[in-house]
Regions:
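Detector for outer-membrane/organellar transmembrane beta-barrel domains
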Residues: 217, 245-355
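A generic structural micro-feature
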Residues: 61, 156, 200, 234, ...
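Sequence/structural signature of outer-membrane beta-barrel proteins
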Residues: 47-53, 90-92, 139-150, 182-193, ...
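Surface-exposed coil loops of outer-membrane beta-barrel proteins
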Residues: 95-120, 129-233, 238, 300-335
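Intrinsic disorder/low-complexity segments
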Residues: 11-14, 23, 216, 288
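Beta-barrel outer-membrane channel/assembly domains of diderm bacteria
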Residues: 2, 14-16, 20-139, 162-172, ...
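Bacterial N-terminal signal peptides that target proteins for export
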Residues: 2-10
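Secondary-structure junction/capping motif
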Residues: 27-30, 202, 271
């Protein structure tokens, strides 16, 4: 009860002070224009997903539709609001497993369960000195490696939180501060999850990201994530890190280092490190990149985790490493991306191994093509193939997606 009172007191206090921004309609000049100048958007995303995983006796064939309506008020004296509702429905037979449909073990998992939910609902304020938002919202930090929205799945991950963004002037360079207090994490598993995955993390967490540019084209970010989950204490951790992104001529550079340890009621006592380095080069419209990413292990007992990340974006689209193996993981990867006419193409190759010991986990090949039919409609084909060695099982995944926005 005390925890609930704290949540809503923080929400009420922030609304009274002010809060932050995303989708905005026109500026209102009177209170009545908050509604008359509001904006409504619709988004529909159809997806067919095929999964052939050697550990399951049957192949998954999932046909789903996400329908989204987003209403945003006009801004009045810096204040505005937003409400966004999503529905996910399967089309045809339910020949796949979700955490809630009782078919795990028969079919591979396709984490797009049916359901209707409020995806976002918040009050925001944007002023000259700061922006802030209170309510259910997206929080996407940097490349979403540590805090993200998992926008790839039909049901998005959003956060019940109070968020404040502050620009701070210093004698050297402006610094941007982004702080969030998070009391619930609304995960991708839908409103009716009754399987092994909780639909939300009950949270008492803090997320802080600060960035500055020491020179044009170069950015340094500092971050701290204190994650405390009542119903998933094994994911409770404290993480501190630094990242750099920049370019020298046609060469792009990215690097991150972080350290993590157990926090609050986590039953595991551990310390682990994270490292990432990537070099890219662009020539005649083709982007090339090579990188190394390590999620370290503490003597093979437990490894570095990022439970709030957009995990599908990293370590292969076959999603074999959503939870880091106890021996950790090293990923050496290569990327080629470009365009053929209006179509965007990208290919990835990953070579996975353990951080602790000498296990060869396997390799993965990924390819995607996206074609814009017009400004409102796009189609995408995407494929992932994971070839297992010492970890998991051979898996093929294929997706066909149609995205429509109005």
């Amino acid at each position: 009860m005390k925890r609930q009172t704290l949540k809503y007191s923080a929400l009420a206090a922030c609304i009274g002070l002010s809060p932050f921004s995303a989708l905005i309609a026109d500026e209102a000049t009177s209170f009545s224009e908050i509604l008359t100048k509001s904006d409504t958007k619709f988004n529909f995303r159809y997806r067919y997903e095929y999964v052939d995983d050697d550990k399951s006796p049957k192949e998954a064939n999932a046909s789903t539709l996400k329908s989204r309506i987003t209403w945003s008020s006009a801004s009045y004296k810096g204040f505005s609001g937003l409400v966004e509702v999503d529905n996910v429905s399967h089309i045809g037979g339910e020949n796949y497993a979700t955490p809630s449909n009782g078919k795990a073990g028969e079919y591979p998992i396709v984490a797009d369960p049916d359901g209707t939910d409020i995806n976002q609902i918040y009050l925001k304020y944007k002023g000259d000195s700061f922006t802030g938002i209170a309510g259910r919202q997206r929080i996407l930090h940097s490349g979403q490696r540590f805090v993200g929205g998992v926008g790839w799945r039909q049901n998005e991950q959003t956060y019940d939180s109070v968020r404040v963004q502050l620009p701070i002037s210093t004698a050297i360079t402006p610094v941007k501060i982004d702080y969030s207090y998070i009391w619930d994490v609304n995960r991708i598993f839908g409103p009716d999850t009754n399987g092994g995955q909780p639909r939300r993390y009950e949270s008492d967490s803090h997320a802080l990201y600060a960035s500055f540019s020491p020179a044009e084209g170069h950015t340094i970010g500092l971050f701290s994530y204190l994650l405390d989950f009542d119903n998933a204490s094994v994911n409770s951790s404290e993480t501190y890190g630094i990242e750099y992104k920049g370019a020298i001529g046609p060469v792009s550079i990215a690097a991150t280092a972080a350290t993590q340890s157990d926090y609050k009621e986590n039953p595991v006592d551990y310390d682990a490190e994270y490292y990432m380095a990537e070099l890219g080069y662009k020539i005649k419209g083709v982007a090339l990149a090579a990188g190394y990413e390590q999620l370290g292990s503490d003597d093979g007992e437990f490894a570095f985790r990022t439970p709030l990340a957009t995990l599908h974006k990293f370590q292969g689209w076959a999603d074999k490493f959503l939870v880091t193996p106890a021996d950790g993981i090293e990923d050496i990867y290569f990327k080629v991306a470009g365009k053929v006419g209006p179509a965007k193409l990208a290919m990835f190759y990953h070579d996975f191994s353990s951080d602790e010991g000498s296990d060869d986990y396997g390799t993965e090949f990924d390819v995607v093509a996206t074609y814009p039919v017009n400004k409102n409609v796009s189609v995408q084909m995407k494929y992932a193939r994971y070839d297992a060695e010492d970890f998991s099982t051979d898996t093929d995944k294929l997706w066909f997606t149609i995205n429509m926005k109005f």
